[in-house]
């Protein structure tokens, strides 16, 4: 179902043994931009900004004579929404602040896991603003590639999409490819009891 992606992989370089640098969005993207571990740049969660004094690969490409352009989500927190990029074709879907996604450790009864559980309960076919946002990312990125200036100097474009993402809503044509005929996931009796106690507690959070 992914002929374009398959073609890009066949004609380019495929990293078959690569791993995400953080399970959380903003820290992962900050690590990607700086080439540093999350522990080095201290972007611990989705509410912590990346310091503007941190050099990114966009800065390095600028010095090498590239035009650097960002289109779409990069989850930059705070007033610096560029971090080295010279152009931005579309602002972030979240806006510059995301403090609501920071864990509140003082209130034990406040759980973000409930939000995640609800996303699965609400999953299904439909149209959501994130899909519309991604459509605009694609449109503006293609428009950028067609600009005459692309042949005048080296360039680097980051086209960054948000989906798949909670809420797990997908357009009908894609939903029908898998559900209900091709998504049989029966329960496994006794599976929870085989898990480490910490993982069992995580299961309790998702049932909150």
Annotated model-derived regions:
Residues 1-208:
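Formylglycine-dependent sulfatase
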């Amino acid at each position: 179902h992914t002929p374009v992606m398959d073609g890009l992989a066949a004609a380019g370089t495929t990293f078959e043994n690569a791993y995400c640098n953080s399970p959380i969005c903003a820290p992962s993207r900050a690590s990607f931009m700086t080439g540093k571990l999350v522990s080095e740049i201290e972007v611990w969660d989705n509410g912590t900004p990346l310091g503007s004094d941190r050099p990114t690969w966009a800065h390095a490409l600028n010095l090498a004579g590239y035009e650097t352009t960002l289109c779409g989500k990069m989850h930059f927190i705070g007033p610096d929404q560029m971090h080295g990029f010279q152009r931005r074709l579309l602002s972030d879907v979240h806006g510059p602040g995301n403090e609501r996604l920071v864990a509140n450790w003082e209130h034990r009864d406040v759980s973000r896991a409930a939000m995640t559980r609800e996303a699965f309960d609400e999953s299904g076919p439909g149209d959501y603003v994130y899909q519309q946002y991604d459509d605009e990312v694609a449109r503006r990125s293609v428009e950028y590639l067609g600009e005459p200036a692309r042949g005048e100097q080296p360039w680097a474009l980051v086209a960054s999409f948000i989906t798949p993402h909670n809420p797990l809503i997908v357009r009908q044509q894609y939903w029908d490819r898998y559900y209900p005929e091709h998504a049989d996931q029966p329960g496994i009796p006794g599976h929870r009891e085989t898990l480490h106690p910490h993982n069992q507690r995580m299961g309790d959070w998702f049932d909150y």
